[in-house]
Amino acid sequence: MAEAERIIGTPDIPDAAGEGQERPDADPEREQQEQEQAPERTRGKRRVAVLFAVALFAYLLDLGSKMLVVAKLEHHEPIEIIGDWLRFAAIRNAGAAFGFGEAFTIIFTVIAAAVIVVIARLARKLHSLPWAIALGLLLGGALGNLTDRIFRAPGVFEGAVVDFIAPKHFAVFNLADSAIVCGGILIVILSFRGLDPDGTVHKD
């Protein structure tokens, strides 16, 4: 009798080994959905890591090149790389990429900051490797020029960007500008191909 009462009074709960009946609040469909989404979340995290790795590489390359140019080229004669066709010459640019809009330094600073915020928001839904590379180039380039605008003379948010790559019959630019242009071109190509940042493909 005591044995029967003990059996009847024992609740159906998992034992120490994790065995027993299923929890009343368990949702098999939800658990299956979470298991299916787990690889997708992992892939998304990897794409975000690629984005920031590309951005960091572009940013450090731009920053290092500018520091070297300021130390070795500023107030010195330009260095000819390919005759007159390509030279390195230190130029302070208060405008946008390739020397455009020098009277709107603060506006371009705000635009660069807005681009960084937009990229950070897109990163949350990023599942495409090409998009990760493109956005990483944009982010690294925007950060590179924004750093100049914040920390260089004549003042905060009005600083002049250091440009030094001077092709013949073309505007002087820097590596941050190159990263921004390459990232923009890649985004245009991806958009024409119908590939979205979340990895979905649209075919017309």
UniProtKB/Swiss-Prot annotation:
Give any Gene Ontology cellular component: plasma membrane
Give the enzyme's EC designation.
Answer: 3.4.23.36
The subcellular location is:
Cell membrane
Q: Name one GO biological process term.
A: proteolysis
Q: Which PROSITE patterns match?
A: SPASE_II
User: What keywords are annotated for this sequence in UniProt?
Assistant: Aspartyl protease, Cell membrane, Hydrolase, Membrane, Protease, Transmembrane, Transmembrane helix
Entry-linked Pfam families: Peptidase_A8
Q: Where is this region: Disordered?
A: 1-42
Active-site residues (renumbered):
163, 177
Protein name per the record? Lipoprotein signal peptidase
